[in-house]
UniProtKB/Swiss-Prot annotation:
<dbReference type="GO" id="GO:0005829">
    <property type="term" value="C:cytosol"/>
</dbReference>
<protein>
    <recommendedName>
        <fullName>UPF0250 protein PA3998</fullName>
    </recommendedName>
</protein>
<dbReference type="InterPro" id="IPR007454">
    <property type="entry name" value="UPF0250_YbeD-like"/>
</dbReference>
<dbReference type="InterPro" id="IPR027471">
    <property type="entry name" value="YbeD-like_sf"/>
</dbReference>
<comment type="similarity">
    <text>Belongs to the UPF0250 family.</text>
</comment>
<dbReference type="Pfam" id="PF04359">
    <property type="entry name" value="DUF493"/>
</dbReference>
Length: 93
């Protein structure tokens, strides 16, 4: 048996500028607008110039990536919960 140190997830220091959020969901009209609207509720300083939208290779999915200033864990959890509640989001990274 080998001794391995406890592995802990990296700690984020808040506020964290340029924190990336990537949202993957079904491609469809208004998906990126919906993602931006939800994230702006929790991060009003969202710079839409950082918005990157990509289609999947077969066009079934869309990924939307933005950069925010993350203020705390509660903010990130609220963004995640609201995005998942839409029913259109498959994954939030």
């Amino acid at each position: 048996m080998t001794d391995t140190p406890d592995v802990q997830p990296p700690k984020i220091e808040f506020p964290c500028e340029r924190y990336p959020i990537k949202v993957i969901g079904d491609a469809g009209e208004g998906f990126s607008d919906l993602v931006v609207e939800i994230i702006q509720r929790h991060a009003p300083d969202l710079d839409v110039e950082t918005l990157v939208v990509r289609d999947s290779s077969k066009g079934r999915f869309l990924s939307v990536q933005v950069l925010i200033t993350a203020t705390d864990v509660d903010q990130l959890q609220a963004i995640h919960n609201d995005l998942r509640a839409t029913g259109r989001v498959h994954m939030v990274l």
